[in-house]
């Protein structure tokens, strides 16, 4: 990796960490019901929403009711989006007169957006109407992100409270996440994107003159036979309320693009400045929630330890991705091609560094938006983002889900440390006993099972024409797909055709299970911890805010998360990389 790339990485991380600190403190005040700067503006609206919906925000819930209410809201969201997709052909705000969405794709999309995955088995600009994009997909971008934040806050309360069954009120946590955090940040980011040229309009499309006076003229079959193909007189450019959807798709670590090529499209991400702003938006809330955790638990050092582990892991994987994409393809050596970094599948306005750093950020978080085609990365350049997903989306991770995922790994870390010293493990003053260990094991083991079992199933019975490349890279496409869907990321090796019934239904099942079969054990863990006494730290207690704990946590994440996938990675990207040197 050259020094310029290193400077970019360090600058990005510095800005991210500086911005995350005040946001994390602000979020802690929001969730603790303390006065904050937005109270005068949003307080009356919050109370009005409670009155209209009949919610008693002062009534707290135990973990079972919290989980039941959360599941009910998300189930309703899935059904609503599915119906909206199927009926969009007869609904307003459809200037391109797009028909209803295929039922298999509609199911996949409804589950995808409700689970914060945003896997897209469709081309946004040619499949979804403006109404579907706004009322269906954008609304789920807010609600799915707020759901993850609410669950994370419930787990924090479980660690902070003592001898109680109450974890808070889901409706209040959801509402405050949207009103006080997601909406203001999205509004500011959308304005910045509009300033940089991202459209925000209800106009369906516009026609424009070609810059090239004679584009796309087909070549003649023979020099003596002139071509009869005529270039179109105008080019058609699809528009829509793009800026508002891009803002929440990044801030909520959703990732679903308004256009088919996502943030590689010049109307979603037109300049290097928007590229930086959107990358910061992807990781901002996940990083900030670490500070929120420290404040709410009463020991800011605990949050800093979690943030340090996340940042060290991200910096390492980002550096590896940058290094892999900064070297020329070995197969081009010796044939007169200049030894320059590969720009295949990348936008020139972002270059290799901007594309590789985005790839690391979008897969570290459960975001999945792309500004370059990961399928065109070098074998190792594509493997490191894939491995970031396979770690369980805990390296910053999704909004809320990244924090509660890393806290689960922290529980496993103190359990392992307790085994080594022969005493009952503790975390934040709470004893970690068999029930907590079982819930943590469920959360950690389900995503790898979904990834590996889904890939095996696709290799055996999946449609053969879905894979565009034979050999190791074709296997990598399938492994990447289920690693993405099984960890609620949503990015893809785009050479995979994922519109068949097998891929849409299998993907929907993987996304559903990896979201809710993890959230329920996390809430059960929170409920169990909330009922425990908080113990004073003794001489044999492992400090969970120091460098030793951070190092142990990183090792546990790498050993438990990464080693699970070594055999599969050996069949895919590693084999492909070795083949380049033959």
Swiss-Prot record:
It is a multi-pass membrane protein. Keywords: Cell inner membrane, Cell membrane, Ion transport, Membrane, Potassium, Potassium transport, Transmembrane, Transmembrane helix, Transport. It is found in: Cell inner membrane. It holds the Pfam family KdpA. GO terms for cellular component: plasma membrane. One of its GO terms (molecular function) is potassium ion binding. The chain crosses the membrane at residues 6-26, 65-85, 87-107, 136-156, 178-198, 277-297, 304-324, 402-422, 441-461, 505-525, 546-566. InterPro entries: KdpA (IPR004623). Coiled coil: none annotated. NCBIfam families: kdpA. The system is composed of three essential subunits: KdpA, KdpB and KdpC. Part of the high-affinity ATP-driven potassium transport (or Kdp) system, which catalyzes the hydrolysis of ATP coupled with the electrogenic transport of potassium into the cytoplasm. This subunit binds the periplasmic potassium ions and delivers the ions to the membrane domain of KdpB through an intramembrane tunnel. Belongs to the KdpA family. This is Potassium-transporting ATPase potassium-binding subunit. It comes from Solidesulfovibrio magneticus (strain ATCC 700980 / DSM 13731 / RS-1) (Desulfovibrio magneticus). The gene is kdpA.
């Amino acid at each position: 990796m050259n020094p310029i790339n290193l400077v970019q990485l360090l600058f990005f991380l510095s800005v991210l960490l500086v911005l995350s600190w005040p946001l994390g403190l602000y979020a802690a005040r929001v969730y603790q019901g303390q006065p904050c700067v937005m109270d005068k503006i949003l307080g009356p609206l919050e109370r009005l929403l409670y009155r209209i919906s009949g919610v008693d925000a002062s009534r707290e819930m135990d973990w079972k009711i919290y989980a039941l209410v959360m599941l009910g809201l998300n189930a309703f969201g899935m059904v609503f989006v599915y119906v909206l997709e199927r009926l969009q052909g007869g609904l307003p705000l459809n200037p391109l007169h797009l028909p209803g969405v295929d039922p298999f794709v509609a199911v996949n999309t409804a589950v995808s957006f409700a689970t914060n995955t945003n896997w897209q088995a469709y081309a946004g600009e040619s499949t979804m109407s403006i109404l579907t994009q706004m009322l269906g997909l954008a609304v789920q971008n807010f609600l799915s992100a707020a759901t993850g934040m609410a669950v994370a806050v419930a787990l924090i309360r479980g660690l902070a409270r003592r001898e109680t069954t109450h974890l808070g009120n889901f409706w209040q946590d959801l509402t405050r996440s949207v009103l006080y955090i997601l909406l203001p940040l999205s509004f500011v980011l959308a304005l910045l994107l509009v300033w940089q040229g991202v459209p925000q309009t209800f106009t369906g499309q516009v026609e424009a003159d070609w810059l090239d006076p004679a584009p796309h003229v087909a070549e003649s079959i023979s020099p003596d036979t002139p071509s009869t193909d005529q270039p179109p007189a105008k080019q058609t450019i699809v528009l829509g309320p793009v800026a508002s959807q891009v803002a929440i798709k990044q801030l909520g670590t959703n990732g679903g693009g308004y256009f088919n090529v996502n943030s590689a499209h010049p109307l979603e991400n037109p300049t290097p400045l928007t590229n930086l702003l959107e990358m910061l938006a992807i990781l901002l809330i996940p990083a900030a929630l670490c500070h929120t955790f420290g404040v709410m638990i009463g020991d800011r050092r605990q949050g800093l330890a979690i943030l340090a582990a996340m940042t060290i892991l991200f910096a390492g994987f980002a550096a590896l991705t940058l290094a892999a994409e900064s070297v020329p393809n070995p197969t081009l050596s010796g044939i007169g091609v200049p030894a320059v970094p590969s720009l295949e599948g990348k936008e020139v306005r972002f270059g290799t560094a901007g594309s590789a750093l985005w790839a690391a950020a979008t897969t570290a978080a459960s975001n999945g938006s792309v500004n370059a085609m990961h399928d065109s990365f070098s074998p190792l350049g594509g493997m490191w983002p894939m491995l970031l997903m396979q770690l369980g989306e805990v390296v910053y991770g999704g909004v809320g889900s990244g924090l509660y995922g890393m806290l689960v790994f922290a529980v496993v870390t103190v359990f392992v440390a307790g085994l080594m010293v022969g005493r009952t493990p503790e975390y934040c003053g709470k004893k970690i006993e068999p029930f907590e260990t079982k819930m943590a094991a469920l959360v950690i083991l389900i995503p790898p099972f979904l990834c590996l079992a889904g890939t095996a199933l696709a290799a055996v019975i999946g449609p053969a024409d879905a894979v565009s490349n034979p050999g190791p890279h074709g296997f990598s496409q399938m492994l990447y797909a289920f690693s993405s869907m099984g960890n609620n990321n949503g990015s893809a090796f785009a050479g995979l055709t994922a519109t068949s019934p097998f891929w849409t239904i299998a993907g929907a099942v993987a996304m559903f299970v990896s979201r809710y079969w993890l959230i329920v054990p996390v809430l059960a863990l929170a409920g169990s911890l909330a009922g425990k006494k908080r113990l004073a730290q003794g001489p044999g207690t492992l400090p969970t805010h120091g460098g030793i704990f951070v190092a142990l946590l990183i090792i546990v994440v790498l050993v438990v998360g990464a080693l699970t996938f070594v055999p599969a990675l050996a069949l895919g990207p590693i084999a492909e990389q070795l083949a380049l040197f033959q």
